[in-house]
Amino acid sequence: MERFLHSQPQQIISQCLSANVLLNNIKNIEVYTLAVSSKSGWVYLDTDELSTKGRYGSVSVADKGHLVKSINLIEFKIKECSFIKIDVEGHEWEVIQGAESFLNLHKPVVYFEAKKELTSTRECIKWFMGNGWDCYWHFAFWYRKNNWRKHQDNIFGGTGDMNILAVPRTKIQPDNFPKLQSENELWDGDLYLKFYSDKQIPLV
């Protein structure tokens, strides 16, 4: 059975995830209350008060706040890794810097959040493209017509999150994602839609 390792630095969110895993009798997910960064140690999170309304998933590393333990990926002693998802609110480059030996050893497919205004996003793309991965854009719209509950009211407009799918060149490459030619390319939701419209293929 495949194992899924999940690292969530916010203790209460980690506890909620662990409770969901337990209540649904899922046996192949392991939840760790840890931050992942460039090195082992401790980091501060700008955690909001959970009694207020907000997006608790948008917490990021800060100069002060709640102190949590941090590790780098190589500390996960596993025999193989096929896929990694990184969503750490602008801290992606630090995670990748700390995971270089891990990534080069396992050559996983990596899916990470991209913020075009951040230099660190370009550093991530540059690293992957220079170390044997091809990179593709993926715009995750917050609303889709084929959503699970079939809601037709789109309250989000065209809002979504831009991400990068990095695939080792030794593996089969997707043909339904826009491929990057350079770390300096700047895509957005409109360009993403145009790619699928021009190619007349289903939106991913």
Could you tell me what each predicted segment is?
Residues 1-204:
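Phosphate/nucleotide-binding beta-alpha loop and adjacent structural elements of enzyme active sites
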